[in-house]
Design a protein with these regions (language model features):
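Charge-dense, helix-prone N-terminal extensions
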Residues: 1-131
Length: 131
């Protein structure tokens, strides 16, 4: 693990405990089981969604991309602004915003799974009542 991961954990320690896990040649940063950032090649990318993405765009920041089958694929993780490395309060603000985006995504997926399960149960009930 590079020195960058412990640096990020220390930078965010006033906000929350942050763990790191290896993934795809980099690391994912997690809080309460949700990945809110990725570190690739000593660069930090934060989770973005429709709520916080405009702040990244306003600063001219770009999403993390990788090549797949000759095409660039963009993830919902955007480059962190440089000032977060000098200002712990900014680091916390951006990390919290990224974690909130991760939480919104997690809740939306959980709701979608619940709706799918309910539809499947309704189909099963309607088939068994015909029989």
């Amino acid at each position: 693990m590079s020195d960058f991961i412990p640096f990020m954990q220390e930078l965010l320690e006033d906000w929350a405990p942050v763990s790191a896990r290896r993934m795809f040649g980099g690391h994912g940063l997690y809080h309460e089981g949700l990945m809110f950032a990725i570190v690739m090649e000593q660069r930090l990318y934060l989770k973005a969604d429709e709520v916080n993405r405009p702040e990244f765009e306003t600063l001219g920041l770009a999403p993390f991309t990788y090549a797949m089958k000759g095409k660039d694929v963009a993830l919902s993780y955007w480059a962190a602004p440089d000032e977060i490395f000098d200002e712990p309060s900014e680091a916390v603000r951006w990390a919290r915003s990224a974690w909130d985006a991760a939480l919104r995504g997690h809740l939306a997926k959980a709701q979608a799974r619940s709706r799918t399960k309910a539809r499947m149960a309704n189909k099963k009930d309607s088939r068994s009542s015909r029989g």
